[in-house]
């Protein structure tokens, strides 16, 4: 599979999910029961979000979480996970020193699960999970942003990031790359691949004077630098 091909990556993701569903049906003996659990976790809150902005929950693997941390570790400032699901990335970020760490998730069941995980880890008072539509979250004070979103919403996310993020911020996108931004570095293969993007110095991303913005590559010890260094602005 081509490393940066979102179509092939999405196909692989669907194949993985199908295999998991088949195993679930075989073990439970009832597709209805599986569907009930699935709907309970994924549907609350979606009715208030336009269809094109809905992002289904698929938890990050341990390898994906580690790749995210490898690209953010040691960076100062606020870290946020947009669509934080069960909170595993936020909790891991706090543990490796990325503080404050905040997760935004619309599904109330997943927010509750994330808070339970934080409580069990002894971090209930240290990490923050907020039930909020990620499209309504202000990113103007964020220095580090992680996202694991569907390819269909990434063009809209680019607009939000470009408009709101301050200079020097870093965006880490898992599973699928941002469609028009040029990454400074990447780590992992296939669905475990994670890309890093830096907002240039000299103003917010939406305030660039030219149509292409130079950025600084800062690969981590386990990451692979990517040639180039330009973020394409929307016309």
Curated annotation (Swiss-Prot):
Show the segment(s) annotated as Pre-methyltransferase (preMT).
43-77
| Known EC number | 2.1.1.-
Q: Does Membrane show up as a keyword for this record?
A: yes
| A GO BP annotation | regulation of mitochondrial ATP synthesis coupled proton transport
Region Disordered: which residues?
215-235
Instruction: Specify where the region named Methyltransferase (MTase) lies, as residue ranges.
Output: 43-77
Name of the protein described by the UniProt record: Adenine nucleotide translocase lysine N-methyltransferase
Family that this chain belongs to: Belongs to the ANT/ATPSC lysine N-methyltransferase family.
Q: Which segments cross the bilayer? A: 20-42
What is said about the domains? The pre-methyltransferase (preMT) region is responsible for mitochondrial localization.
- Return the annotated region ranges for N-terminal sequence (NTS): 1-22
User: What reaction does this enzyme carry out catalytically?
Assistant: L-lysyl-[protein] + 3 S-adenosyl-L-methionine = N(6),N(6),N(6)-trimethyl-L-lysyl-[protein] + 3 S-adenosyl-L-homocysteine + 3 H(+)
Q: What InterPro entries has UniProt attached to this entry? A: FAM173A/B (IPR026170), SAM-dependent_MTases_sf (IPR029063)
Q: How does it sit in the membrane?
A: Single-pass membrane protein
> How is this protein annotated for GO cellular component?
mitochondrial membrane; mitochondrion
What organism is this sequence from?
A: Homo sapiens
The compartments listed are: Mitochondrion membrane
What Gene Ontology terms describe what this protein does at the molecular function level?
protein-lysine N-methyltransferase activity
Among Gene3D superfamilies, the record links this protein to: Vaccinia Virus protein VP39
Q: What does this protein do?
A: Mitochondrial protein-lysine N-methyltransferase that trimethylates adenine nucleotide translocases ANT2/SLC25A5 and ANT3/SLC25A6, thereby regulating mitochondrial respiration. Probably also trimethylates ANT1/SLC25A4.
Keywords associated with the record: Membrane, Methyltransferase, Mitochondrion, S-adenosyl-L-methionine, Transferase, Transmembrane, Transmembrane helix
Top-level class of the enzyme under EC nomenclature: transferase
């Amino acid at each position: 599979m081509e490393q940066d091909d979102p179509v092939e990556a999405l196909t692989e993701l669907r194949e993985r999910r199908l295999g998991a569903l088949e195993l679930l049906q075989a073990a439970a003996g009832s597709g209805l029961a599986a569907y009930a659990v699935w709907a309970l976790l994924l549907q609350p809150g979606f009715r208030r979000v336009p269809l094109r902005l809905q992002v289904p929950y698929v938890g990050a693997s341990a390898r994906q979480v580690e790749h995210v941390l490898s690209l953010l570790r040691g960076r100062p400032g606020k870290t946020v996970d947009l669509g934080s699901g069960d909170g595993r990335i936020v909790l891991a970020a706090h543990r490796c020193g990325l503080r404050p760490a905040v997760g935004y998730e619309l599904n109330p069941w997943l927010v509750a699960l994330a808070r339970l995980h934080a409580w069990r880890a002894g971090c209930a008072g240290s990490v923050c999970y907020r039930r909020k539509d990620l499209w309504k979250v202000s990113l103007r004070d964020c220095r580090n942003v992680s996202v694991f979103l569907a390819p269909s919403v990434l063009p809209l996310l680019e607009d939000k990031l470009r408009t709101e993020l301050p200079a020097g911020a870093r965006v880490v996108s898992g599973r699928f790359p941002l469609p028009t931004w040029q990454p400074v570095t990447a780590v992992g293969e296939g669905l475990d691949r994670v890309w890093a993007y830096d907002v240039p110095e000299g103003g917010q991303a939406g305030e660039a004077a030219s149509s292409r913005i130079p950025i600084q590559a800062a690969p981590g010890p386990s990451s692979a630098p990517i040639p180039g260094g330009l973020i394409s602005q929307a016309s």
